[in-house]
Amino acid sequence: HYFGAIPTRVMAFMKDLEYECLKLGIPVKTRHNEVAPNQFELAPVYEEANLANDHNQLLMTIMDKIARRHQFRVLLHEKPFKGINGSGKHNNWSLGTDTGVNLFGTGKTASENLQFITFLVNAVSAVYKYNGLLKASIMSATNAHRLGANEAPPAIISAFLGSQVSACLLYTSDAA
């Protein structure tokens, strides 16, 4: 049951995993049940792309190691069972310059906010316009088994902006 109580054995595994991640400098958050039976979520916190890739590889290795200590097995396949939700393998990303400027970061001045809005609108437009190309470049064959609706993995690529950014864009469009 989504967001239900996590079974005691699983909670012990997750706490051990989070502790190992902390010791290794892998920033993680989120701990909850997923929709599919015996599926649980742990989310790495965003960081610089190369470091995030290294941390994801290390995370998958230690997940397997700690799972075995708890007499579990970890399935990292996107859709291990036909017709049952799998891992959506969400990908959250941002863009930055070589000097560390976050191009999707809001600013303190009108020109800094204009930069944010410009990059945001173009990124969302690209997700809409090049949806098929994005899917072809990021979906493995096994992650292409879509269930549709709100089931993981979904049949769509979406851009969730949150209420504050959505309100900012609405205000900007109304002011124009």
Locate predicted features.
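Carboxylate/His-rich catalytic cores and anion/metal-binding grooves
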Residues: 1-25
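A short glycine-rich, hydrophobically flanked beta-strand micro-motif that places a catalytic Asp/Glu
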Residues: 30-33, 73-81
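Flexible glycine/proline-rich, aromatic-decorated loop/lid segments
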Residues: 83, 87-99
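Polar, glycine-rich mid-to-C-terminal structural blocks
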Residues: 118, 126-170
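Short, conserved phosphate-binding/catalytic loop or strand-edge motifs used
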Residues: 34-42, 87-89
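Conserved small/polar residues in nucleotide/adenosyl-binding loops
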Residues: 171-176
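Helical (often loop-to-helix) elements that flank the catalytic cores of nucleotide-handling enzymes
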Residues: 51-68, 95-127
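Short, hydrophobic beta-strand segments
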Residues: 39-49, 93
